[in-house]
């Protein structure tokens, strides 16, 4: 919050006054991260209509979907601070009484729809695959945050290949 306030030329209190709550500021930061993540993936996939992807109406090849996810993990590997912030908030929000609980429920549901949509044209069970992809991403990121020497991208590529093979897919 302090860094964001400084970048905006405001005090912490001034920033929170304009946004509403500390959680609101954090959600704004995470929403901006999501927008950047979509842009990273779109830079690989071309002109992506994310609403069509989310609805399962896009026709992405397995190769394109895997390349987009690889680019996302590669991008995340360059920003441990925001990945750490996200992981901490996501885990704190497991408690139903946490002010961000509903936010993370909605965000996970949205992410699962995006991932399922990316594989809708190729996977026999895209919703199952999307849940495994999300679990893999979150789990590997947490391991990488604890053990920075872990090659996040290489480990991701290998594990995703194994998951895809379990769904009868290959790149």
Predicted regions and their residues:
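Helix-turn-helix
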Residues: 1-28
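Generic hydrophobic, amphipathic alpha-helix propensity
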Residues: 4, 29-33, 37, 115
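Short helix-capping/turn signature of helix-turn-helix
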Residues: 19, 88-96
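Conserved acidic functional residues
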Residues: 23, 33-34, 138-142
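Hydrophobic alpha-helical connector segments
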Residues: 28, 41-82, 129-133
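Amphipathic alpha-helical packing segments from all-alpha helical-bundle domains
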Residues: 38-39, 62-67, 78-82, 97-121, ...
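Hydrophobic/aromatic-rich alpha-helical bundle segments in the mid-to-C-terminal region
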Residues: 97-106, 120-171
């Amino acid at each position: 919050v302090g860094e964001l306030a400084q970048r905006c030329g405001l005090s912490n209190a001034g920033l929170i006054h304009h946004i509403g709550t500390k959680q609101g500021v954090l959600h704004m930061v995470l929403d901006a991260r999501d927008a950047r993540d979509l842009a990273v993936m779109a830079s690989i996939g071309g002109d992506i209509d994310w609403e069509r992807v989310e609805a399962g109406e896009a026709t992405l090849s397995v190769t394109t979907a895997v390349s987009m996810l690889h680019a996302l993990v590669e991008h995340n590997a360059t920003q441990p601070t925001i990945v750490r912030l996200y992981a901490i908030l996501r885990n704190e929000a497991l408690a139903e009484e946490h002010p961000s609980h509903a936010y993370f429920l909605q965000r996970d549901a949205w992410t699962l729809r995006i991932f399922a949509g990316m594989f809708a044209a190729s996977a026999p069970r895209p919703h199952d695959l999307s849940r495994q992809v999300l679990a893999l991403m979150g789990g590997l990121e947490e391991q990488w945050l604890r053990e920075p020497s872990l090659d996040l991208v290489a480990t991701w590529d290998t594990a995703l290949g194994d998951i895809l093979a379990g769904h009868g897919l290959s790149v």
